[in-house]
């Protein structure tokens, strides 16, 4: 069993050595453990720090590409080098690397395809009450779109089996976290959760500038992933809703026509026609998308 622990980094020179030092080198059931650092256009000594700590596998971006691209490039590299399982953590040392064996256990036992660490966000001291609620809301949206019951969908500390990674297709440029869950849930993969306690905060998030930007980008990623697998739900609703709305003006026109008052109600026909055309277009898109 060959496991790759991949660490996406952007200017993590100060904290990367702590992350590398805390990664267990001997894990029951694992024959080979490799460490991969993805340098996402760092301008500090991140790569130098990785090499000084003996990291043999490094993927470098000449400019910052974002977390999703770093994750995808790391996965491609790990799979090309024979990884059976890929563990993703972070270069800021927010996650307890000593819990990596607990993430691997359900996969090694054949019980899960993906294992996600539950940070228990309600108990994280530096999270504001608003942020905790938004984390809970985001996880709820992901669970609704994926058909899962995960307590912490935004956690980046997770393990993927080779089989699961070969079936996932990350298309967003923001964050892979929620998108891969929506895809995995709709592909009926087995996903488990493991409770952890995060390490003390070392820096502000570089993934987004404020919580509202994070909400917008996360929401967009969730909707896009949902549409990839269940386009019939929103498009079907749109087709039915606009079709019904479109029929109402026609019925109204017919009522006036039978009463001999059809003049002056052409606007109803125009509006109704527009709605029915929209309904037909939605139905056509549904067929194509499905």
What do these predicted ranges mean?
Residues 57, 61-80, 85-87, 97-174, ...:
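Acceptor/aglycone-binding surface of glycosyltransferases and processive sugar-polymer synthases
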Residues 21-32:
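Short, acidic, metal-binding catalytic loop of nucleotide-sugar glycosyltransferases
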Residues 2-4, 34, 179:
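Cell-envelope/extracellular polymer assembly enzymes that use nucleotide-activated donors
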Residues 171-290:
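Hydrophobic helical membrane-anchoring modules
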Residues 7-21, 41:
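Active-site beta-to-alpha loop of glycosyltransferases that engages the nucleotide-sugar donor
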Residues 31-41:
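Short beta-strand/loop segment that forms part of the nucleotide-sugar
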Residues 4-8, 36-37, 60:
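Short hydrophobic beta-strand elements that form part
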